[in-house]
Amino acid sequence: MQFSKMHGLGNDFMVVDAVTQNVFFSPELIRRLADRHLGVGFDQLLVIEPPYDPELDFHYRIFNADGSEVAQCGNGARCFARFVRLKGLTNKRDIRVSTANGRMVLTVTDDDLVRVNMGEPNFEPSAVPFRANKAEKTYIMRAAEQTILCGVVSIGNPHCVIQVDDVDTAAVETLGPVLESHERFPERANIGFMQVVKREHIRLRVYERGAGETQACGSGACAAVAVGIQQGLLAEEVRVELPGGRLDIAWKGPGHPLYMTGPAVHVYDGFIHL
């Protein structure tokens, strides 16, 4: 099986063309391939498939390193767009795709950045899903013997965002896994730790569902900005500084889609016997 290794700000992917290859990935095989000592090593596996709708260009599936399938991955979307152009599967700059979450339009810019229409953030608890009696801008949670204030939102996948004074000293490794599997998140959640530098700039670390802390999380950056705007902390255009680099997020508020712009890097091509 041929594959490519790619990354978006250090969030790394094994990308497989299932348009021209017949492939099947069991959870066990994905876990083996994801192992950084015994396999290829990656945060997520991206599988490119033919479209199910003639109006679309592709369908793609996203699997975490633990073998679980997820509906959305912002960094993966950008790598997907670069991959299909690099491999000659399309020469379009505006690429229409479907995922388990719905449809997206990805735009490759003249400077080889990728702009992704991530859709409108959904703050309804049932959409996240999150156990709450009603939608609030801020929720109070108990975890690890602490009282935590957070915002929750769906960006096609579940996110919890906590504001911290300094991301460098935030309890990502201890609080992240506790909140990820908290009983109020029946499908688990991605946990973002956000430091507001100013209204147009935040720093962010994300403990990803099924992957742990990663160098960058595109949907996590979108979630942090959406929650920050909802809570009146941020402007409509925000620079997000992650351990792996920078993303630019823009959202005009309710009734409008959120846009993410950032890089996608092709590292190498490989071949593996399954």
UniProtKB/Swiss-Prot annotation:
Example of a GO biological process term: lysine biosynthetic process via diaminopimelate
Pathway assignment: Amino-acid biosynthesis; L-lysine biosynthesis via DAP pathway; DL-2,6-diaminopimelate from LL-2,6-diaminopimelate: step 1/1
Subcellular location: Cytoplasm
One GO MF term: diaminopimelate epimerase activity
Main location: cytoplasm
Active site: 73 (proton donor), 217 (proton acceptor)
Keyword Zinc-finger in record: no
Cellular component per GO, a single term: cytosol
Keyword annotations: Amino-acid biosynthesis, Cytoplasm, Isomerase, Lysine biosynthesis
Important for dimerization, annotated site positions: 268
PROSITE patterns reported for this sequence: DAP_EPIMERASE (PS01326)
Name of the molecule in the record: Diaminopimelate epimerase
Catalytic activity reported: (2S,6S)-2,6-diaminopimelate = meso-2,6-diaminopimelate
Binding residues annotated for substrate, in chain numbering: 11, 44, 64, 74-75, 157, 190, 208-209, 218-219
